[in-house]
């Protein structure tokens, strides 16, 4: 293949690759609050400057599952600024977009929308931070997709089987099959791969003429028996896998020796954890693809905050530190101060060479005090650097080295694991564990209202969809249903009779599985509705500031006043109270502190708040409990791969294929482990099709 220049690009795809941008991370921090937004703008600037065909993101565009209004607004602002314009898009989509974007209300790529003017489309899968949740299975990326600023692909709604249909792209004579799979809990996806429940669909015609890219967002390094996805699980016809979720930058593609495809790990564009993997220089990649040849150009990010980390083992300096010396703590503190100053000097020299870099660096000194040493007070030490570092509270980290037992882990034969017969499938699921537990549990802890199936589905909602109110709402829903059943039957308020009727009711419900499923769906819908209602009520309460509290003061009248809960009308009701006479305003027995105007413990009457743990007996002596409006957040933590690989080398792939330009939208399922002519290798500089390409490399 002849060498091409930047002006001869009609057959060459230019793709900007990035992942784990984590917009909104520490957005309330006075120093680091804007770091993610600044770096995101830099990434878009590089894409615009290099006139890429499209941007490919590997997940975790947002740090929070429900980003703040500031984060959403800033993201939309950047996308409108850099992605909209009059420049024509030079590639076309050949696949059936109704299949690629089947979960979208606008099932087509955004640049083909006649109402939009997109010149630089973005394709992105979701990560574990911004994954779809709730009854409607929506995420923040769906907001951007609905606005026409991003193409969200790689979604899977089934927990039983996943069919990955590629987006087929063509530019000139180069054809790319873009596969994507959004974040799925690693244990579940591992099980699905083993059970052969994941299938990658391929075009029926000229399947060897496509450059196959796969974007994935999972654990790449092993963190447990099944808490990661081995590279050997991926199909061997893939040419390049873009691996998100791992934050260490290993963007130079590395070849898998068994599957023979290449894997690039761009890493995060912002430091989210003070670990060694995050200290590696941050890069994004400019990928060029022509035919089945590729070349990755690394672009160093200039706006990333400098991060220096160093380890100190006190036991390695016996000439300086003696644990029996009464002044050893002062000596350790002086030694640590010297180390921190050295790192600050290095950070300042690096910043002077790059004016776009933030002024305050991230500094962390990890001190191993094994050997009888005692740590000093970190808080006092940190105060000396409040104005010089971005993380003053985390400068010093003391730890003790623990000798780990050597694990005799034999290498796993993944080929044998994937070729297991169906009779040996791994069928362990959360809902099955719940059912097994309650069926074998002692009588005193067995379920009396819910069936094992219902509880298992509630736990599945809690685990898989992060629906924090799932279990609570299902229990409440079934409690209310049982109470209504008992009231309708006019059962005497005797515990034995009630228990017997509850048992009969439970058995009748267990036999009707369809009605059980409907009740679970109704309870989950109500959980979402109650959570939304709670947000509205909380907002109204903060705006009005005078909502009734429903609490009875302990020092009020000793008279037997029925305490009933009634929601006030906020500010309007408080103003009405001002119109009363002065005697009414000062009638509280406790004086000024308890006036109706200034205290929440006034002499109003309130309904009692039912106990959350209400029993069946409450059906006969209390009102129906009100739904919970509690909300909770879920925080995920990324595990960083600490291996470092900053080597840079151009890569090219070659294959003897026939180029065909016919459009295709049908696919055929192919075995993932079939042996075929790969046609993927490293080429020498003499054969590099981009040898004469004028590329501007950024200074590291």
UniProtKB/Swiss-Prot annotation:
Keywords: Chromosome, DNA damage, DNA repair, Endonuclease, Exonuclease, Hydrolase, Manganese, Meiosis, Metal-binding, Nuclease, Nucleus, Telomere. Core component of the MRN complex, which plays a central role in double-strand break (DSB) repair, DNA recombination, maintenance of telomere integrity and meiosis. The MRN complex is involved in the repair of DNA double-strand breaks (DSBs) via homologous recombination (HR), an error-free mechanism which primarily occurs during S and G2 phases. The complex (1) mediates the end resection of damaged DNA, which generates proper single-stranded DNA, a key initial steps in HR, and is (2) required for the recruitment of other repair factors and efficient activation of ATM and ATR upon DNA damage. The lineage of its organism: Eukaryota, Metazoa, Chordata, Craniata, Vertebrata. The active site is at residue 129. This is Double-strand break repair protein MRE11. It comes from Gallus gallus (Chicken). It is an enzyme of class 3 (hydrolase). Residues 521-533 have a biased composition (Basic and acidic residues). Its cofactor is Mn(2+). It holds the Pfam family Metallophos. Mn(2+) 1 binds at residues 20, 22, 60, 247. Component of the MRN complex composed of two heterodimers RAD50 and MRE11 associated with a single NBN. CDD domains: MPP_Mre11_N. It is found in: Nucleus; Chromosome; Chromosome, Telomere. Residues 651-677 have a biased composition (Polar residues). SUPFAM superfamilies: Metallo-dependent phosphatases.
